[in-house]
From Swiss-Prot:
<dbReference type="Pfam" id="PF10232">
    <property type="entry name" value="Med8"/>
</dbReference>
<comment type="function">
    <text>Component of the Mediator complex, a coactivator involved in the regulated transcription of nearly all RNA polymerase II-dependent genes. Mediator functions as a bridge to convey information from gene-specific regulatory proteins to the basal RNA polymerase II transcription machinery. Mediator is recruited to promoters by direct interactions with regulatory proteins and serves as a scaffold for the assembly of a functional preinitiation complex with RNA polymerase II and the general transcription factors.</text>
</comment>
<keyword id="KW-0010">Activator</keyword>
<keyword id="KW-0805">Transcription regulation</keyword>
<feature type="coiled-coil region">
    <location>
        <begin position="30"/>
        <end position="59"/>
    </location>
</feature>
<keyword id="KW-0539">Nucleus</keyword>
<keyword id="KW-0175">Coiled coil</keyword>
<dbReference type="GO" id="GO:0006357">
    <property type="term" value="P:regulation of transcription by RNA polymerase II"/>
</dbReference>
<keyword id="KW-0804">Transcription</keyword>
<dbReference type="GO" id="GO:0000978">
    <property type="term" value="F:RNA polymerase II cis-regulatory region sequence-specific DNA binding"/>
</dbReference>
<protein>
    <recommendedName>
        <fullName>Mediator of RNA polymerase II transcription subunit 8</fullName>
    </recommendedName>
</protein>
<dbReference type="InterPro" id="IPR019364">
    <property type="entry name" value="Mediatior_Med8_fun/met"/>
</dbReference>
<comment type="subunit">
    <text>Component of the Mediator complex.</text>
</comment>
<dbReference type="GO" id="GO:0070847">
    <property type="term" value="C:core mediator complex"/>
</dbReference>
<dbReference type="GO" id="GO:0003712">
    <property type="term" value="F:transcription coregulator activity"/>
</dbReference>
<feature type="region of interest" description="Disordered">
    <location>
        <begin position="1"/>
        <end position="21"/>
    </location>
</feature>
<comment type="similarity">
    <text>Belongs to the Mediator complex subunit 8 family.</text>
</comment>
Length: 239
């Protein structure tokens, strides 16, 4: 019995179909990889910071929190990382919005199923959605505060204008009067009477006694300023 030689091109034998080559020339690998690395750095920094705080909360007597300067440096690093990834996302916004992600035939779906479902997710995760809404709320509050501050500036400007008007009005009223000393016309007329002269003499005697007492108790025997001198200095800048 003769045997038919094995023919690999026979239709009954399955052949391996070669996959078409995929063109990745339009994909900015460097930018996407940089974003991924930045996200990984932020995740590691936050994880380390959270572990330090949680360990201290669980064992406050055994594990102490780092110094304030350490936390300040860590926050500065996080801010720098967030600013960097924000700029990269902003510069590649069109690319990230318009790029359709799909697995190639050689993608290891079994080993990286979670990654695949994450990449193909059309709706953001609940925690991300909450973070975005919180950021929008903060921006709305800041905008409202700016408007309120502008209104406050307008109110302050009106107050300044009102103060200027008051000063001008006081100056106009002051120009209509003549001020000599600290007594009214009625008081000056009373001081010319015998009773008024007697009151002035008694007042001067009391002031002299008070000045003598002050000279004994003040440092260096210096004479204190009279209240009228203080008022004159406050009003006219003269002693």
């Amino acid at each position: 019995m003769s045997q038919t030689p094995f023919n690999p091109n026979s239709p009954s034998v399955p052949t391996t179909t070669s996959l078409p080559s995929t063109d990745f020339s339009q994909i900015p690998y460097d930018v996407l990889e940089s974003i991924r690395n930045r996200l990984n750095q932020i995740r590691q920094s936050l994880t380390k910071l959270a572990d330090q705080i949680n360990n201290h909360n669980r064992h406050p007597q055994k594990i102490k929190l780092p110094s304030y300067s350490y936390f300040q440096n860590q926050f500065q690093v996080l801010i720098t990382q967030l600013m960097s990834i924000t700029n990269q996302l902003y510069n590649n916004e069109d690319l990230l919005r318009n790029t359709n992600v799909y697995p190639t035939p050689i993608f290891p779906t079994s080993a990286h199923e979670n990654m695949l479902t994450t990449l193909l997710r059309k709706k953001v995760a609940p925690e991300v959605d909450e973070w975005i809404n919180g950021a929008k709320l903060i921006m709305e509050n800041e905008t409202k505060n700016k408007l309120d501050n502008q209104q406050v500036e307008i109110d302050i400007l009106k107050i300044d204008q009102w103060v200027q008007w008051c000063l001008a009005k006081i100056q106009d009223l002051r120009d209509e009067f003549q001020f000599y000393g600290f007594h009214t016309v009625e008081e000056l007329d009373h001081m010319e009477t015998p009773q008024g002269k007697q009151e002035i003499k008694e007042k001067k005697d009391k002031e002299f006694e008070r000045e003598q007492i002050e000279l004994k108790i003040t440092a260096g025997g210096q004479k204190s300023l009279h209240p009228n001198q203080v008022l004159k200095f406050m009003c006219q800048g003269q002693i």
